[in-house]
From Swiss-Prot:
This is Endoglucanase 2. One of its GO terms (biological process) is cellulose catabolic process. Keywords: Carbohydrate metabolism, Cell wall biogenesis/degradation, Cellulose degradation, Glycoprotein, Glycosidase, Hydrolase, Polysaccharide degradation, Secreted, Signal. The active site is at residues 100, 433, 480, 489. GO terms for cellular component: extracellular region. It is found in: Secreted.
Length: 515
């Protein structure tokens, strides 16, 4: 009479055990699938991103001026060897800006700042692909120029060449013979934004070389401090004081560069003075609550992200009132990028690309994607699980998914089925607006007769590997024509942003907590 209930209990226990076992198995399968799906989203393209990164790095070599060392670009040679001679300084190094032979200090300094940031955040990823030394070499080639362009505390040479004269020619840099005039800023003709951006570049680069070359790092930091003081104590826009630059790299203001430079100097020195500057000038220059687009002209989004980094990792600053506006605006920038966010920007093509400007359209989606991966990695590394966007919450993986979508579009997942990174994939631009790439290396072509190569119907004889062209129109279309400089001209600052983005995507998400 007693055995039956016991038998029922045993059966029930076995039954419950089986149910639990099945539940565990289902949970394990779900977890594996979930991880697998995440891996498919974030990992299946890692090899593609790595290959693209290797290609992207080559464009810095293509753009080098000066006496080339260990040159692996067969169609490039020494050029610009006398640059700076009229001021008795050596400005032979540096990078040509785009498809021409100009050296514009403002975007070149931005290139150096972004490349430094990329190395600081993702140097380990670069090293795993044997690209770190290459990146540091490209950076030093640029900062060597910037150091020489700053011969005294309140003087900075910001341009080599006259763009009007330069654009009347279509020739190889190795064969140009025209006079290379210099443009400078000083206390009589200030240019706060250029001086401050160059200070940011020097400060960021000083961190890159802090361990490998302490003497060079110290030199960079000395110049950074001097340039920041020069910029702050002699405020004035270079676009106003030198109107000729307005047709090329016109600045919309210098407040963002001052905050950007002070932020980098704080990271490089931990001198409270620079953090105080940021806190005291944030209301005036920070444009709090108004998300904007990171570019060679607008450093605010980058500043917001860089300063929010301190709230993630710096003890005692997580609740800093002086950084609150920067952190909140950084969050607003991120919320605007996630497509399903209630505050998502509508500035996108039907193909899903962030689209802000017809000229150099890819700069903004690539820069936005780079910032998104940075912020995602800051969240993951610090254990912050959610980003609040109005009444909805998003995960770091949502930011990373957005970043991948922009990278994938750039690399060929777009309506044109074209890679906009030259040399990557089966289809990419063949008529890039780039003088050196368009003229055979053995051609004896001068200034004027070189235009036959601009107007040639034949693809470029030299492939400008790693060049990121301007990109598509709002309707996702692209015209691969050499005279289409709006869509088909590359630039060095685009390359710095691409290197940062791709470096962040070649491995699992993580971030160093301090530089």
């Amino acid at each position: 009479m007693v055995a039956k209930p016991r038998s029922r209990c045993c059966c029930c226990s076995v039954f419950i055990g089986v149910i639990i076992l099945i539940a565990i198995i289902i949970a394990v399968i779900f977890t594996i699938r979930h991880r697998s799906n995440h891996s498919d989203d974030d990992g299946s393209n890692v090899k593609n991103y790595a290959n693209a990164l290797k290609i992207a790095m080559q464009f810095f070599d293509i753009q080098k001026s000066g006496k080339l060392e260990n040159n692996e670009i067969s169609w490039r040679g020494d050029s610009g060897l006398k640059d700076g001679s009229e001021a008795s300084i050596d400005l032979s190094k540096g990078l040509y800006d785009a498809g021409d032979h100009m050296k514009f200090g403002f975007p070149m300094a931005f290139t150096a700042t972004v490349l430094s940031w990329s190395i600081l955040e993702y140097g380990d990823q670069m090293a795993s692909l044997n690209l770190l030394d290459h990146a540091k070499d490209s950076l030093k080639w640029t900062t060597d120029f910037l150091i020489n362009a700053h011969p005294s505390p309140n003087v900075l040479y910001i341009q080599v060449g006259d763009p009007v004269t330069d654009h009347k020619c279509w020739d190889r840099p190795e064969t140009m013979t025209r006079k290379r005039t210099l443009t400078k800023i000083d206390t009589k003709t200030p240019g706060t934004e250029v001086a401050a951006e160059t200070a940011a570049a020097m400060a960021a680069a000083s961190l890159v070389f802090k361990e490998s070359d302490t003497k060079y790092s110290s030199t960079l930091l000395k110049h950074a401090k001097q340039l920041f003081d020069f910029a702050d104590n002699n405020r004035g826009s270079y676009s106003v004081n030198i109107p000729e630059v307005q047709s090329y790299y016109n600045s919309t203001g210098y407040g963002d560069e001052l905050l950007w430079a002070a932020s980098w100097l704080y990271h490089a020195t931990e001198d409270q003075t620079y953090l105080d500057f940021v806190s005291e000038n944030g209301e005036e220059f920070g444009n709090f609550g108004s998300p904007s687009w990171f570019s060679w002209d607008n450093k605010l989004p980058g500043t917001h992200i860089l300063l929010s980094r301190l709230t993630f990792f710096k003890k005692g600053l997580s609740g800093s009132k002086g950084l609150q506006g920067f952190k909140e605006t950084a969050e607003a920038v991120m919320c605007g990028l996630i497509p399903s966010s209630p505050t998502a920007t509508s500035s996108r093509t039907d193909g899903g690309l962030i689209w802000v400007s017809e000229w150099n359209a890819l700069q903004h989606p690539v820069s936005s994607a780079f910032l998104a991966t940075l912020y995602s990695d800051y969240m993951l590394t610090s254990g912050v699980k959610e980003l609040s966007c109005s009444d909805q919450s998003f995960k770091p993986s949502d930011l990373r998914k957005f970043a991948r979508s922009q990278a994938d579009y750039m690399l060929g997942k777009n309506p044109e089925k074209m890679s906009y990174l030259v040399g990557y994939g089966e289809k990419y631009p063949e008529f890039v607006h780039h003088r050196g790439a368009s003229i055979p290396a053995d051609a004896t072509t001068g200034c004027k007769d070189g235009f036959k190569w601009l107007n040639s119907d034949e693809p470029n004889p030299n492939v400008a590997y790693g060049a990121l062209v301007g990109g598509p129109f709002l309707n996702d279309t692209f015209i691969d024509a050499r005279n289409n400089s709006m869509q088909n001209e590359p630039s060095t600052y685009n390359s710095a942003l691409v290197v940062g983005l791709l470096s962040s995507l070649v491995t699992t998400s993580s971030s160093v907590e301090s530089f």
